[in-house]
Amino acid sequence: MAIAKEDILAAVEGMTVLELNELVKAFEEKFGVSAAAVAVAGPAGGAAAAVEEKTEFTVVLTEAGSNKVAVIKAVRELTGLGLKEAKDVVDGAPKAVKEGVDKAAAEEAKKKLEEAGAKVEVK
């Protein structure tokens, strides 16, 4: 007589954790398998995506330098902020000046800020 799946499930459902552990070990021995989790392979194109060039950059003002007024003017010109907001950005360095811009815009902003005397990073 064959045992129905429902009967097996009902028997397993009534077992304690210790009994379930012993059952798993018995299955491993009987059928030569392992109950260890299977490592899932990543997507095949994962390596290509990692090599892909970054398209969005953030320009970070790390230090205002000695000519703070010129740096504030440069920040105002680049961001369109008011005088007080631009001063707060410069005083709060390190702070992002431009976010999510393309490489050319990031390099241009870095150049303007460095010409004004600031220290800048592009991330």
UniProtKB/Swiss-Prot annotation:
Pfam families reported for this sequence: Ribosomal_L12, Ribosomal_L12_N
Gene symbol of the encoding locus: rplL
Subunit field text: Homodimer. Part of the ribosomal stalk of the 50S ribosomal subunit. Forms a multimeric L10(L12)X complex, where L10 forms an elongated spine to which 2 to 4 L12 dimers bind in a sequential fashion. Binds GTP-bound translation factors.
InterPro entries per record: Ribosomal_bL12, Ribosomal_bL12_C, Ribosomal_bL12_C/ClpS-like, Ribosomal_bL12_oligo, Ribosomal_bL12_oligo_N_sf
CDD domains in the record: Ribosomal_L7_L12
S-adenosyl-L-methionine in keyword set: no
Function: Forms part of the ribosomal stalk which helps the ribosome interact with GTP-bound translation factors. Is thus essential for accurate translation.
Protein name: Large ribosomal subunit protein bL12
GO biological process: translation
Gene Ontology molecular function, alphabetical: mRNA binding; structural constituent of ribosome
Species whose genome carries this gene: Burkholderia vietnamiensis (strain G4 / LMG 22486) (Burkholderia cepacia (strain R1808))
Gene Ontology, cellular component aspect: cytosolic large ribosomal subunit
TM region positions: none
Keywords in alphabetical order: Ribonucleoprotein, Ribosomal protein
Similarity remark: Belongs to the bacterial ribosomal protein bL12 family.
Lineage top rank: taxon: Bacteria
